[in-house]
Amino acid sequence: MKTKWNSKLTTLLTGLIFGGCASFEPGLRYQELMRARVPTVKETSEGVDVSVEEFATASKSRFAFDADLASYGVLALLVRLENNGAENYHVHQNDIRAMMTGQSLPFLSPIDAANKAVTSEYVGKALAWTVATGPFFILFWPATIAGSSSHTQSVNKRIQEYFEALSFNGSLLKPNQVASGFLYFRLPDGLKKLENLSLELQISEERTGKRPNFKLSLPPLDVSG
């Protein structure tokens, strides 16, 4: 009888922990990236519109990624290109860079960005909820820790897939086509405000090889959280 009661209590406790744990619930969907949005900055050249929308501030970052990325040293910028001209253009990630006070910010892959920021925040939330169960956590920790670990791994995988799905990939941009996605960069430690931040990129015209340049300067951004 005691074993049966312990089993039921363990199941109840594990369910309570998972129910209380903050799940990964971003407010942005992939389909929304292709729609026209209000950018932070926009520039046009050779019939191609290039816009950048910041997701560095805490409110926008939490909307898109359910976490304050900048507090973990990750900068997310949504880049959108729309070809309103008559030529085909190639867009390569290697031709894009983020600059701040004259220094290039290192690229982060979607997986690295996810691991550095959101998965860390989720693990912290999960542990906090687990410990918050008090003495029950001590009594049943082998079962709750095992279940929590499995659950966390599942959520971490979903977070990584989300970051990858929303990331910007190089593409051939034909007339009347749109390319859009997030680029992730590593921020220096301890920043509270981003100043002199810009995104520089080149696109390559397929027919002639001409390479229009874009430099989009963003306003100062408060990332103090």
Regions found by a protein language model. Give the residues of each.
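Conserved functional micro-motifs across diverse proteins
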Residues: 21-225
